[in-house]
Amino acid sequence: ATTAEVKAEVKEATKDMPKITTKGKIKVTSADGNWSFQPIGRVMWDYINTDEDGSGTDDFDGTELRRARLGFQGSIYDWGYKFEGDFATAGEDDNDKHSEVSIKDAYVSYGTKFDDKKLVVKLGQSHVPFGLNTAVSSKYMSFMDRPLFADSTISPARQSGAMARLTSADYKWSINAGYTIGSLKTGSTDKDDVGDTFSLRGSFVPYMADKNHLIQIGAGYMNVSDDSDDFRFRQRLVSHKDRTRHLNTETISGYDGSDAFTLDAMGVYGSFHAMAEYLDYTADFDTASDVDITGYAIEAGYFLTGES
C-alpha cells in the first residue's frame, strides 16, 4: 500500500475517535463536537514585604502560595459544567488558618439561542453578576490581588444559587441576573447566616473594532435581605498575606439588609488597557445608624512584549 493509502485508512479508522487539542490548554472533544472535557488549573506565588509605619502592628515579610487551583470543565450538547477547587487559600477561619479545599466554581449550565440572542442559565456556585473587578478572572488581572472592595462582603465574587445571562450574538450588550444564598466555601451554605442576595448587571460595548480594540461600559445593582442579624466588613491592605485587617467595622448587630450599586468602564487598545470602577454600598440597621461604604479603583497597563 502506498503512503497515501495508509493515511486514508488511518483517517477512516480514527474519524469517530475523540480529538485532543493542546492549544493553550488540553481539551478532549468528541468527533461530532457534541461533548468536551478540559482539565483546568493555575498556580500563583506571592512575596510581600510590608512596613506598618507606626500602626501598632508588626511588619510582615513572607511568601504565599496565593492560588493553587485544579478542576475541570466541559459541555454535553447544550449543557455545560465546571468544577474548580483552590488548594492554597482553602478553609480560612477567623484566625486565618487553612484547613480544607475551598470550592470556587461548581455549577451546571444550559445554553440556547433564539433570534440574534444567546441565553445561558447556571445552577450552582459561580460569579455574582454585580461588579467588574470581581468578574474578571485572576488569570487576566495585572496585579496579584483585587481592589480592596472587591471579593468581600460589599462586593462578593462567587455565591451559590441561580444565574441567567442574556447576550447579543455579537456580544455588544449583556444582561445578567442572579439569586444566591451565600458561598459554598467548603461545601454548604446557610441562608440564616447570609440572607438572600439578588443581583443584576448590564454592560454594553459602544466601540469595538475587534477583540483587541474595544470600550465597554457597565453597571450593577445588588440587594441583600436581612436574614442575618449581624454585619461585618473587613479587608486586608496591600496583600492577601498581610493578615492585619486595617479596614474592619467589627460586628454590628441589628442588620436589616443592604443595597449597593456599581458603575464601571474598561477599554483595550492593542497592548494598552485601562479600567475603572466605582461602588456605593449602604447597610441598614434597626438599632444603629446606617453604614455607607464607597470605593473606587482605577487601573491602566501596557504590555511591552506586544500581547493584548
Predicted regions mapped to residue ranges:
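Intrinsically disordered, low-complexity segments enriched in polar/charged residues with Gly/Pro
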Residues: 13-15, 57-59, 252
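Outer membrane beta-barrel
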Residues: 24-226, 293-308
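Surface-exposed beta-loop-beta
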Residues: 54, 192-292
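Extended acidic, Ser/Thr- and Pro-enriched interaction/regulatory segments
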Residues: 18-23
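Cleavable N-terminal export/targeting peptides
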Residues: 1-15
